[in-house]
């Protein structure tokens, strides 16, 4: 355990006692160092190690602690002002820094300090919360929300109104993860630490949480909390055991490999689904 991690872990144990007035200098500095590290991409709340996603709980704890050490303050924003504990990521950005970091931010997009945005990303009017990581070449479309500590892979498209759940309220154990080369359809929600593996296509209006049944129609297998790589998913329903009613589920209607995904348009994949 590093010294920085040890400071965060110790502070989290006594978090109820920590306020902007009572926090000691060492703890304050440690929390700020973590937030800066998350902001720059040095740290990630979750990362893939040896093929498995690993959550660094101490980094998530630092994010939670950051709310304990800061008072609300006036935050300037275009034609308005805000009043919050967390600064905005781009508050002190210059044109040179935007050019250097290489992403686009459309007016009214909001990113909190402590979120990382990779090169070649496009942020339409959307919201990215503290601790989140947005991978290279990803599009966050209009009114999409990337929740606290959520991990978004490379070359992902989060369509209009998509919600990717966070970990802070309600408190979740692990962040929601969207793998590389995924497409998440308009108004879909992926929450509660669900992992969408690489190369998945999620149709419009699909809702997936930890208790959602993810039914593979080819194999009959039911998954919870994880969408297997290369899945094409639509919303559906499964009959109850008594046969008197049906309950919502997500249905894996087909699997595609990276080669097919690269050649075939998203709309074609979804339109070619046999009923």
From Swiss-Prot:
Q: Name one Pfam family in it.
A: Hexapep_2
Listed under catalytic activity are: (S)-2,3,4,5-tetrahydrodipicolinate + succinyl-CoA + H2O = (S)-2-succinylamino-6-oxoheptanedioate + CoA
What gene, per UniProt, encodes this protein?
A: dapD
- UniProt GO cellular component terms: cytoplasm
Q: For this protein, what is any one GO molecular function term?
A: nucleotidyltransferase activity
Q: What is its EC number?
A: 2.3.1.117
Keyword hit for Acyltransferase: yes
Which positions in this protein are listed as binding substrate?
Answer: 104, 141
Q: What is its main location?
A: cytoplasm
Q: Which organism is it from?
A: Haemophilus influenzae (strain 86-028NP)
Pathway, per UniProt?
Amino-acid biosynthesis; L-lysine biosynthesis via DAP pathway; LL-2,6-diaminopimelate from (S)-tetrahydrodipicolinate (succinylase route): step 1/3
Q: Which HAMAP family match?
A: DapD
Name of the featured protein:
2,3,4,5-tetrahydropyridine-2,6-dicarboxylate N-succinyltransferase
Cellular compartments annotated: Cytoplasm
Under NCBIfam families, the record lists:
dapD, PRK11830.1
